[in-house]
């Protein structure tokens, strides 16, 4: 054994060939943490010191190659001063460069996923052989960063600037075949032939059949583009990528600028340019929020997986209420492998549900995400029915009938009488109390809420609502079923609106106040979209449905009359009474026309101004900043209340619920991280400036206490530098 550590071993294979193997003890995957980097330094030094070494094969002892850097270390690392961070980055890069500069040929055998630093390790080798099932990529832009272990330097010199820009700026993974096409790898082989192929390649390089030094040289030189080619490649790409990424996600454009700045330099100087730019990105609030988001997401998944120990396996599901929502739920269950009954009392509703499922499956087939055989299998897994005849062996029933407590209670009581005594019943409700609905049931312990978001196939979140009498098994089984459906479940306690809608309606309340103060809703939409929301509040209400918003607002006003009840007629009342219900009937705040793809396209409709005139009670001058604060303060404060009231258990779950459920701007990290980024004390002072607007703008006593103690929700303050 030439070197033995906890993450890396180097052993002799045959005839001077050694294998550097990544196998991080106690972990299911390999990653570049401090330990792995330190051991790579020692391993490279040990190889360099051994005169008998003629060639190096790099491999992995895990199912994956290396998934990248250990992101849990980023939070503390990125707090370091800029100069210290740059020095640390260059020190790490020296390891990869020393590996690249070994006086013998190097081959990496990529057996599974190689992402971020994992791929950058591969790029430092002379040759790359990849398993046909492996995938590679540089996803750092998704964290508000770009590659920092030489990715912006080596990749353009291996696959060309255009291809490298596409890989780095998109952050997408590539298949083995796609990687071969652009020259990122040298050979694709069947998984079982990978080791033999790597051995064959290294032997041919040692024998001189392949010139490894000539292969290595372009990575050490400047980029082979003249001034005109550089201008065409970089300026065009910057414009295109800036348009796609938008101003709130600077990393993709900064990555292109870095490749451009380093184009006329050799490797070592180019790495210095990369390090400076990488650290600049690491210090942005976008990176800190997106890294926080990634860690929150990991925490969420780990927590949801923790319910598996108590959960029953759902082998057969059912959905009550077909139509678009029922069809969407049936599709999601079937396509992920759980057969489902779809029941309704009307044949036409069942047909609508089946059409929805068929349309969604057809869409996947067209995009090549599904084979015709798999589509047929999924369709066969959805069984339509008008009766309860087959409900005896159902493990879990999702009730998805109209959002009316009396109707839901009647349907739930009826289905309870037709299922086994251990069957879980789950109500897909957006606002109605689960404990209230449970009063109609004989076995309330088997009952929970399971709130899907529309459209079901696209929205990743499912709120699993624990009622007063819900058993742990019922909650756990529903969480496990949601995960099986490919969703991200968050368990919340019962209250009107649960987490997401309870927080969303104060946001809509801020919007209604602005319109009543004479602010143009089109302007509000533009300001909030610029702030980072995927759509402004008026457009969002049109998509949700004005009737749905009207009903939800009444439920919330009844649940929280102290702050959510408004005796004045509002913008929602005006549109509802004028039967302008949004996209569903072609007119709401906006009018809707059908585009070439058959999708609704919004257009301004002057007729709406007459509808809104009676609810404009004053004409206020408000700045864009005021618009943001009128909208965001109530949303953030209600999120704080949900955490304090125990509706949601952790700050991470609260923030992820808003990002997954209502499209909260990811680069801002969620409502609580947004408060942290402003500073809790500063946020409280800001809210106090708007105190005249009512109870929704009043910070809680506990938040004031946090402000006075200098506390934060995530134990750190994120600030733009």
From Swiss-Prot:
Q: Give me the residues that bind NAD(+), please.
A: 325, 344, 401-403, 408, 430, 454
Instruction: Give any Gene Ontology cellular component.
Output: fatty acid beta-oxidation multienzyme complex
Gene Ontology molecular functions: 3-hydroxybutyryl-CoA epimerase activity; delta(3)-delta(2)-enoyl-CoA isomerase activity; enoyl-CoA hydratase activity; long-chain-3-hydroxyacyl-CoA dehydrogenase activity; NAD+ binding
Q: Which SUPFAM superfamilies match?
A: 6-phosphogluconate dehydrogenase C-terminal domain-like, ClpP/crotonase, NAD(P)-binding Rossmann-fold domains
- Enzyme Commission designation: 4.2.1.17, 5.1.2.3, 5.3.3.8, 1.1.1.35
Query: Superkingdom of the source?
Result: Bacteria
The site feature described as Important for catalytic activity is recorded at 120, 140
Which reactions are catalysed by this chain? Answer: a (3S)-3-hydroxyacyl-CoA + NAD(+) = a 3-oxoacyl-CoA + NADH + H(+); a (3S)-3-hydroxyacyl-CoA = a (2E)-enoyl-CoA + H2O; a 4-saturated-(3S)-3-hydroxyacyl-CoA = a (3E)-enoyl-CoA + H2O; (3S)-3-hydroxybutanoyl-CoA = (3R)-3-hydroxybutanoyl-CoA
Annotated catalytic residues: 451
InterPro entries, alphabetized: 3-OHacyl-CoA_DH_CS, 3-OHacyl-CoA_DH_NAD-bd, 3HC_DH_C, 6-PGluconate_DH-like_C_sf, ClpP/crotonase-like_dom_sf, Enoyl-CoA_hydra/iso, FA_oxidation_alpha_subunit, FadB
* Binding, substrate: 297, 501, 660
Kindly indicate whether the keyword Lipid metabolism belongs to this entry: yes
Segments for region (Enoyl-CoA hydratase/isomerase): 1-190
Query: What pathway does the annotation place this protein in?
Result: Lipid metabolism; fatty acid beta-oxidation
Biological-process GO terms, alphabetical: fatty acid beta-oxidation
In the UniProt record, does the keyword Nucleus occur? no
For the region 3-hydroxyacyl-CoA dehydrogenase, give the residue spans.
Answer: 312-721
UniProtKB keywords: Fatty acid metabolism, Isomerase, Lipid degradation, Lipid metabolism, Lyase, Multifunctional enzyme, NAD, Oxidoreductase
**Listed NCBIfam families:** FadB, PRK11730.1
Q: Which family does it belong to?
A: In the N-terminal section; belongs to the enoyl-CoA hydratase/isomerase family.
Q: Describe its assembly.
A: Heterotetramer of two alpha chains (FadB) and two beta chains (FadA).
The protein's job, in short, is: Involved in the aerobic and anaerobic degradation of long-chain fatty acids via beta-oxidation cycle. Catalyzes the formation of 3-oxoacyl-CoA from enoyl-CoA via L-3-hydroxyacyl-CoA. It can also use D-3-hydroxyacyl-CoA and cis-3-enoyl-CoA as substrate.
Cited PANTHER family: TRIFUNCTIONAL ENZYME SUBUNIT ALPHA (PTHR43612), TRIFUNCTIONAL ENZYME SUBUNIT ALPHA, MITOCHONDRIAL (PTHR43612:SF3)
Q: What is this protein identified as?
A: Fatty acid oxidation complex subunit alpha
Q: Which organism is it from?
A: Pseudomonas savastanoi pv. phaseolicola (strain 1448A / Race 6) (Pseudomonas syringae pv. phaseolicola (strain 1448A / Race 6))
Q: Which gene encodes it?
A: fadB
């Amino acid at each position: 054994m030439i070197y033995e550590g906890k993450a890396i071993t180097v052993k002799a294979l045959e005839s001077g060939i050694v294998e550097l193997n990544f196998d991080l003890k106690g972990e299911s995957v390999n990653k570049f943490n401090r330990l792995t980097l330190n051991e790579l330094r020692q391993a490279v030094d040990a190889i360099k010191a051994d005169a008998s070494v003629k060639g190096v094969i790099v491999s992995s002892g895990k199912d994956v190659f290396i998934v990248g850097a250990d992101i849990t270390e980023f939070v503390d690392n990125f707090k370091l001063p800029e100069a210290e961070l740059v020095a640390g980055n260059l020190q790490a890069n020296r390891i990869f460069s020393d590996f690249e500069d070994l006086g013998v040929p190097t081959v990496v055998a990529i057996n599974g996923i190689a992402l971020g630093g994992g791929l950058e390790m591969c790029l430092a080798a002379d040759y790359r052989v990849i398993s046909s099932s492996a995938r590679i990529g540089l996803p750092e832009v998704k964290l508000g960063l770009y590659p920092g272990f030489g990715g912006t330097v080596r990749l353009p010199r291996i696959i060309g600037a255009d291809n490298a820009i596409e890989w780095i700026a998109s952050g997408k993974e590539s298949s083995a075949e796609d990687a071969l096409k652009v020259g990122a790898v040298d050979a694709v082989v069947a998984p079982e032939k990978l080791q033999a192929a790597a051995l064959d390649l290294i032997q041919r390089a040692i024998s001189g059949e392949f010139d490894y030094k000539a292969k290595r040289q372009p990575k050490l030189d400047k980029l082979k583009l003249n001034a005109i080619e550089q201008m065409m490649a970089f300026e065009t790409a910057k414009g295109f990528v800036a348009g796609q990424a938008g101003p709130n996600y600077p990393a993709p454009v900064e990555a292109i600028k870095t490749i451009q700045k380093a184009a006329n330099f050799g490797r070592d100087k180019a790495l210095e340019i990369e390090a400076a730019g990488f650290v600049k990105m690491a210090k942005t609030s976008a990176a800190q929020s997106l890294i926080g988001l990634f860690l929150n997401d990991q925490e969420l998944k780990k927590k949801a997986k923790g319910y598996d120990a108590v959960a029953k396996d759902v082998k057969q599901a059912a959905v009550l209420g077909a139509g678009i929502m029922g069809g969407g739920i049936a599709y999601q269950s079937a396509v992920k492998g759980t057969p489902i009954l779809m029941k309704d009392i009307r044949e036409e509703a069942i047909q609508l549900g089946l059409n929805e499922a068929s349309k969604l499956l057809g869409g996947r087939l067209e995009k090549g995400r599904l084979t015709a055989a798999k589509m047929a299998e999924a369709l066969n897994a959805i069984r339509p029915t008008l009766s309860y005849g087959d409900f005896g062996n159902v493990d879990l029933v999702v009730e998805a009938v109209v959002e009316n407590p009396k109707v839901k209670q009647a349907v739930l009581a009826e289905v309870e009488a037709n299922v086994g005594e251990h069957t879980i019943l789950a109500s897909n409700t957006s606002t109605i109390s689960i404990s209230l609905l449970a009063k109609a049931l004989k076995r309330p312990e088997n009952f929970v809420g399971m709130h899907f978001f529309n459209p079901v196939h696209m929205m990743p979140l499912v709120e699993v609502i624990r009622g007063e009498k819900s058993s742990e098994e019922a909650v756990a089984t529903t969480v496990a079923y949601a995960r099986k459906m490919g969703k991200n479940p968050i368990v919340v306690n019962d209250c009107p609106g649960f987490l997401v809608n309870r927080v969303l309606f104060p946001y809509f309340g801020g919007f209604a106040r602005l319109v009543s103060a004479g602010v143009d809703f089109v302007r509000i939409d533009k300001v909030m979209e610029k702030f980072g929301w995927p759509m402004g509040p008026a457009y969002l209400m049109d998509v949700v449905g004005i009737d749905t918003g009207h009903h939800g607002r009444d439920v919330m006003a009844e649940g929280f009359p102290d702050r959510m009840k408004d005796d004045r007629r509002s913008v929602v009342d005006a549109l509802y009474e004028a039967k302008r219900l949004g996209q569903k009937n072609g007119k709401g705040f906006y009018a809707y026309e059908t585009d070439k793809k058959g999708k609704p396209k919004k257009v301004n409709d002057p007729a709406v101004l007459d509808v809104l005139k009676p609810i404009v009670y004053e004409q206020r001058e408000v700045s864009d900043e005021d618009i943001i604060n009128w909208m965001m303060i109530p949303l953030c404060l209600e999120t704080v209340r949900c955490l304090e009231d125990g509706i949601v258990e952790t700050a991470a779950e609260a923030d992820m619920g808003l990002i997954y459920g209502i499209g909260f701007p990811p680069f801002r990290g969620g409502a609580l991280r947004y408060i942290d980024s402003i500073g809790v004390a500063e946020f409280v002072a800001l809210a106090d400036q708007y105190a005249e607007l009512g109870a929704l703008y009043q910070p809680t006593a506990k938040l004031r206490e946090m402000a006075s103690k200098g506390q934060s929700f995530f134990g750190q303050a994120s600030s733009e530098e």
